[in-house]
Structure formats: C-alpha cells, structure tokens
C-alpha cells in the first residue's frame, strides 16, 4: 500500500523556510525505515510555486497491516507534534 500525505504550508512560509522544513521532514521520516513492513519513504517537494498547489508529498510504501504501527511510531508523533503549526492543510490518501 502507498500512504500519501499531501501538505500545504501556511501562507507565511517562504521559500527559504520551505527548504529548511524539507530537510527536517526528510530526517524525521527517514526513521520509518527501521519499522518492519515499511518498504520505503519519499519526501517530494512540489516544483510549481502557485497558491492553488500543495507544497509537499510524503509517500510511504508499507504493508496495509503496518498502518497502525506507523500511526504509533515516534516519527509520526514528531511529525504531528512539531510540524502541524506550519500546515494550512493536509490530505491523506492510501492506494494499492
């Protein structure tokens, strides 16, 4: 299963801050590689800077049964705790 998180930053987040956040978020999500059932993680920035676009895609390749383990993981808790303040909105989408 692919677990996708589309991220839209708050309007006051400039390009320099987006670059800093990208580096930090990649580091946070790199910790998922230690979890059995997670096969890969990609943190992909959008290449078109328009107000009607999302800024970031986080795509996690995992076994469907691993989703509760991911939800309880330290990287997921760090993501929700430390980065929610930068987000205008996010969308979650899962597919096989």
Q: Where are the model-predicted features located?
A:
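Short S/T/G/P-rich N-terminal loop/turn motif that feeds into the first structured element of a domain
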Residues: 1-54, 65-69, 96
């Amino acid at each position: 299963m692919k677990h996708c998180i589309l991220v839209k930053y708050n309007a006051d987040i400039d390009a320099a801050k987006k670059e800093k956040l990208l580096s930090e978020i990649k580091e946070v999500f790199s910790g998922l590689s230690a979890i059995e059932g997670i096969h890969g993680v990609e943190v992909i920035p959008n290449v078109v800077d328009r107000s009607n676009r999302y800024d970031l895609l986080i795509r996690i390749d995992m076994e469907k049964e691993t989703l509760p383990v991911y939800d309880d993981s330290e990287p997921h808790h760090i993501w929700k705790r430390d980065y929610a303040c930068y987000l205008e909105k996010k969308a979650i989408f899962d597919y096989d």
